[in-house]
């Protein structure tokens, strides 16, 4: 990764991802995270705001002058905040229903960065009984076909995938086998997506199983940390060439305890330029 980025930054590039669950309501913790963790790029999911109302000013005050957004009123929405110039490449509607769940950009060095918010899929893991579950599976299948076309292109795919694939990605594999996000059919679908471009799971590259690794804890828990019933729903996947430049990855569990928290936490990978 060289060229423009190397000329204008340090010798590393830090990219973070966070389902923020309303960017306007949680702008205080967004700016706190940006100030403390100092990512060069932050991808947000579930921004819940139309493009014209997106809060640019506090982000630009911190140096994030390049903002690409694909928003929707009160629901869904994705955004990419960057100190590095970005060119929007695409925004796909993998449900054909107008929901704002994806935006892709290209960095000056040619790296493609794809930010996605996969549907949660409702509560019942049955396509016939729960149309939302079928929509989720179809969304992932369409992503899989799209992913096949990315072979040979340096790409980082990040976001809330709403699937925790491994046993050590959930607090209880046995109890969650029939719970949407960890069912075998979802895990198999995500596996096909990963195989479509030989994606490298950066979280598990640096924190290999069976080590515990979570990015989400329900609001329903009175004490989320004590109960620790977490799941790893958020992911950063890289094409092999990009993964080879990754030097570190971390999740920020302390953010779950901040004032007005999201139920998700940020994750960040650092790359050598």
Say what each PLM segment does.
Residues 47-125:
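Structured beta-strand-rich core segments of catalytic domains in phosphoester-bond hydrolases
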